[in-house]
């Protein structure tokens, strides 16, 4: 849990103070965590700096499918306003690309269900998760289709991995 908090916080530009508060550690430990993270993953720091630079030059950043997020305040003289835009320059390509990918997966899953006469219904999408209402006799086939389409929605250097959980409600499925 702490690793996830630190990872997402650092990627999205959390301050030493913010990380210390969120993880309930002192500022020294939070600073060491952030410094250690960037030493271990220098390409993350490079990505963050490059994203900000691109936004400053173009006034926007893009997702992997080239949807643009305009950042009119990226060159603001107001540090607070600029900082918000900088965090968005880092975050928007990541979250926007994830949204692009899941939408491709959703469309392909829907098409497969239609083509194969599957009665299961996609009922909810939350971030990188899809929820379905599935007749018992379709469980195995739906799982195969969903995992296949989620994992192959977009080809990347690092393979996408998907899994399925089952239950009578959302809580049980987790």
Regions found by a protein language model. Give the residues of each.
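Conserved catalytic core of nucleotide polymerization and phosphodiester-bond processing enzymes
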Residues: 1-174
